[in-house]
Amino acid sequence: MMPCFVMLFGICCLAGCEGSKHHLKKVRLNEVAHSIFYAPQYVAIEKGYFEKEGIELELTTGFGADKTATAIISGDADIAFMGPEATIYQFNQGNADYLINFAQLTQRAGNFVVSRNKEDFQWENLKGKKVIGGRPGGMPEMVFEYVLKKHGMNPQKDIDLVQNIDFANTSGAFVSGKADYT
């Protein structure tokens, strides 16, 4: 009878500990952008799946791979969602302590072309128009220029490419009328 009591008491004690905030491992995640591509993560946060796995997830948005990489290097984040460009730049500069990319999160780039006007979009519509691009050398900008070239356009000649707006301010700049597309 005593072994059953001890076992029952132990189970009750363990059950009382489940879900306790005191035992959660804090993980600081810095995402490059708040994106529809990370929707499964946002659902998991809202549904409490991380807590059920013993993780207290602290989510911040870096608004650019350069800032997200800086958060990792400075110790302000434990893990990051971003493209590989920051790692490549660090490695090419000869940094001994460069970042390591270890997983592919999405199958494709998260680029969208947004127009000021409702139209049946064709890539040729961009010719001669002002377009807010990304940071030179950043993954979104490199992908955008690649796609333009695949559609027979020269990004430096065929469009008026704006690349001097900080990532966090691009949507505000577009809404305020700074470009025809973003």
Positions of PLM-derived features:
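Bacterial N-terminal signal peptides that target proteins for export
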Residues: M1-C4
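C-terminal motif of bacterial Sec signal peptides marking the signal peptidase cleavage site
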Residues: C12-G16
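Short, conserved catalytic or interaction motifs in soluble domains
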Residues: G19
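Short, glycine-/small- and polar/acidic-enriched structural segments
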Residues: H22-S176, D180-Y181
